[in-house]
Amino acid sequence: MNEQVRSILAQETTKTSKIRQLFLLGVPRAEIARMVTNGNYGFVVNALRRMREREGGLNIHPATAALDYTFNRKFGIEIEAYNCSRERLARELREAGIEVTVESYNHTTRPHWKLVTDSSINGNDTFELVSPILVGEAGLRELEKVCWVLDLCEVKVNESCGLHVHIDAAGFSMETWRNLALSYKHLEPVIDRFMPASRRDNYYCRGLGHVSDGMIRSARTVDELKGRIGDRYHKVNLEAYSRHKTVEFRQHSG
C-alpha cells in the first residue's frame, strides 16, 4: 500500500484526483489532508462530497460509507483585538457583505455580528467582535471572510486579547461533559506548551488542575460539574451552557 500511495502522490495531476485515489485506497481523510493539502482537512471533506454528488456515491467499504464527517455543528466566536475603530471596522465588514452593528458591552446573542467594548483589553481602539450563531462549513466560510477584513484593517492583538469559541452543547450527555472536563484537564499541560505565556495562567482563563478526577467523575449534572470547576473565567467555561447552551473554550490567544 505504501508503494501505491507514493505512486499516487508522484502523479502530475490535480489534488482532487489524488484525494479520490487515496480515499478509494482506504487512506483516512486526516492522513490524505496531511499528504495532499498540507493539513487542510476541510478541503478534503469538500472534495469528497463533490465527488459523491457527481458520481452518485463512491465505491467504498460499507463501514467507511456509514461515517459522515460533515461539519454541521453550531458554533460562535469572540475575537478581541485593537488598533481599528469599531466604526471603521463596521464599515469594512458591511462592504464585505457581513451584517454587523456597533453596540455597548452586552451578552445578548444577535442574529448578526456585533462590535462591543471590553474593559479587559489594552491598547488603542480596542474592541470585541462577536459572531451570531454560525453553522457548519458555511459558518467557517463567513468567519474566513471576517478574518480577511480584520487583516485589511491591520488590527493587532497583545497579551490582553483572547479568542473564545462557543460550541453547541445542547445534545451533550452527562458522560460527554465529564469526558470533556477530564480530557482538557489531562491535556492542559500539552495545550499550554503551544499557547503564549499570557494564556497559561491568566485570570480570565484559569486551568482545571484544581478539580480532582474524582470530583469530575462523580458529578451528576452540568450545574454540579460547573460548580466544581468554578466561574466562567476558566479555560473551559461551563457557565456558557446556562446562558447559550454551549461550552466555551477561552484559552486561545487573540
Where are the model-predicted features located?
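Short, charged amphipathic recognition helices of the HTH superfamily
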Residues: L25-M35, G162-H164
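Short, basic interhelical loop/turn and adjoining N-cap
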Residues: A30, R34-R49
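C-terminal accessory/tail domains of diverse enzymes
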Residues: E31, G42, E53-K156, A170-G254
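Short acidic, low-complexity intrinsically disordered linear motifs used
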Residues: T14, M51-R52
